[in-house]
Amino acid sequence: MSSRSASRTCLALRHVAFEDLGTLEPLFRDRGFRIGYIRAGAPCPSVREWLEADLCVVLGGPVGVGDTESYPYLKTELDLVRMRLESRQPLLGVCLGAQMMAHALGSRVYPGKAREIGWGTVSLTGD
């Protein structure tokens, strides 16, 4: 679908301000998506808005899916993820979002031996 096609809606649930859709955002926009960001901990979208979006993305953050006692808003987000999965509408989970999807589908999600984040230094070589 090109940007000339009818506009579609992508809702992105963001857990920290500096973690957005990144390189996916221009790809989505080029395919006719209007992007709406929802800040975690702020009022979540209505169930209707969440289920009617053409695409939902749950982004990463510095917490884990098991941190619901410290971050109670994760419970609401997990409910939204479950509903979206049950609706069989497109849902993309990145990092924490993938944890939430796995948990909602009944998988055991647990911390690894070391913390990790999804970036690192890249150096050019002579090869």
Feature-to-residue mapping (PLM):
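Conserved beta-strand scaffold positions in the cores of enzyme catalytic domains, especially
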Residues: A12, I35-Y37, V109
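Cofactor-binding loop segments of dinucleotide-utilizing enzymes, especially the Rossmann-like FAD-
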Residues: L13-H15, A40, L96
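Short N-terminal binding/cap micro-motifs at the start of the first secondary-structure element
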Residues: F18-T23
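Flexible gly/pro-rich beta->alpha loop and the following alpha-helix that scaffold active-site loops
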Residues: P26-L92
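Catalytic nucleophile loop
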Residues: R84-R108
